Amino acid sequence: MPLVWYEGKVLKLELKEIEKIAKENYSAAKLQNKWYECVNFALYLLDEKIESENIYILAGLDSDDYDNINKYFFAVTNELKIVKMDEDINYNFLCYLGRKVHNDEIEAIYALTILEKMYYQTNDKRFWEWVEFGNAVDLLEDGITYYEYDINKDNLCDYIKEKILLDIDLYKEQLPDNFFKMAFCEKCKKLVIPEIKKTLFRKKFFYKCNNCKATSKFLWCSDNKGKKLYLERKNSPNTRFNADIVDKPQIQVRRMLDK
């Protein structure tokens, strides 16, 4: 049976969306053993009135029939001229999770658990911040608010949803070194790595801007608000963004506290 595409006419935009969903669903199959998502891709195509013998066979397979799912999924993607399925697989999986969470198909907390594990599974440094964020969520459960994240028990799920979408936008950006230790100074508006200072009796620490030396509040790049501001400045045609970055080595908090 030949491939039927709306009587032979499919817009390029539709083709791009089809390729996007194919790669996202395949990433879930490959990284999380969710091979039923390849079957779901065939069902999606049929809903879009895109038909072929291979699509019908794939749509009818049991979710645990790995060998045939793999065989017919690639037969379908070949028909659709979709290539390089393994390219950017980690990014595609992040997009997959973003879609699932946005559509309320999986819970935000469950997505957080998956993303924490992704760092250890893939060694992709982009996922390390999810490990740190997970630690902050654990502290929140104990009634402790971590300074870098504007989270509470009421906004946590919405925060995670937004965080995933922002990380999708940031994933392919060429970020500065130590980006997730950077912050925007409230006073001078520069992007800096705040210096850690201790009080006289060394019982407390505070942050100081290494540009204007103010001890004002900081908008951390690990937080959603900081990421949004970074993207706004990065994409603004009127901002000399690189000139606004003040990057100096930071002494780690734990090391300071141990002294």
Where are the model-predicted features located?
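Acidic, Ser/Pro/Thr-rich low-complexity regulatory regions
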Residues: 2-259
